[in-house]
Amino acid sequence: MTEAAPDAPAGGEVRPFREPGRVPSRKSSRLVTLGVTGDWAFAAGTLLLALRRHNPDPGAHILVFHDDGLRPSDRGLLESLGARCEPFSAACDGLRPEAVRLLSPLSLAKFACFRLLADYESVLWLDTDIVVQDSLDEIWQCGPLALAVEDPEFTGEGRTCGAAVNFYEPVPGVDGDAPNLNTGVMVWRRGLRDPEALERRCLDFLQAHGPKLRYPDQAALNALAQWMRAERPDDLAELPRRFNCHPRSPAAVYAPVVHAFGAYKLWNDGLTAACFPEWQRDYARWQRLGGSAYAGPVDNAAYGEGGAFYLLRGLFDTIGKSEQALKALKERLAAESAGRKKLEDLLRRLQPRL
């Protein structure tokens, strides 16, 4: 169902997560993975900027899977931020057209994380509609396979959806009433038994039930987790919700990871964007570095008029005007200082006469 492109080795050397020009001191035992289509390169770049700031020395490599729509300039910028970019082909045969429209094909790249355990002690997957707000040191200890129960604040009713939300119709052997597991943040850790067999189980599930799947990656991983809960409970762990917190949750203010799953993202909804100015600052930095911008529509833009959301549409001008104002202020202060010095010199010359 999915496979890495022939020139994209699944477990090869990847560029260390470090400041540009800094030579890594050792081979890392940790890997951060992302998957991005070309039109979402801005989201990956913004995420990496936050990851770097809050985790300046995480001892992790970064691997960004991408489709053939990634611009060379964006790829170069992602690599300058410490990532290795690898092409990934996702076969969506058998899925409904509406499911293909709903999902990012690169979300299927997360299944490759099972086999990446052959080269790393821990592998972390992050969807790109995420804000990193704090250190991720604690997340690496989760596992052997860890994923979070969907944040109940997402529904607005204080309840978690059932796993049935991932399906167009029931699938035998899958409990649709079980709490839905969100797969936007996942951890794989060495000690997980037969990881490649688990990957194959997920891919076989996609192949067997494709037309029934609304959110294919999440459907397959929920089915896998239900099987593991019965057959291998020691291999399955619940990821603490603070590592997969929805923006609607009051806990999002302090959560290390905020995940804007659902229709409203940090870049297409003014209300959501206004709540996370840190994401906007990083997004503006990405563009200042030469990265591509979000090109789609924005809902609820009025919430941000004149406020934080203005950064998304006009931060370049704002920064430029601020720099000009600071320059003018410095020049005025210098002129005032020169004038004051002249006045002081004049007073000193007049002092003996007074």
Regions found by a protein language model. Give the residues of each.
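Short internal beta-strands
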Residues: 61-68
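Conserved glycosyltransferase catalytic-site signature
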Residues: 44, 107, 111, 130, ...
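GT-A fold catalytic core of metal-dependent nucleotide-sugar glycosyltransferases
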Residues: 87-91, 108-159, 187
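Short, acidic, metal-binding catalytic loop of nucleotide-sugar glycosyltransferases
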Residues: 50-58
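Short, charged/polar "capping" segments at the starts of alpha-helices
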Residues: 68-74
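A glycosyltransferase accessory/donor-loop signature
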Residues: 2-36, 46, 64, 190, ...
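Active-site-proximal specificity loops/subdomain of glycosyltransferases
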Residues: 74, 80-116
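Conserved catalytic core of nucleotide-sugar-dependent glycosyltransferases
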Residues: 141-204
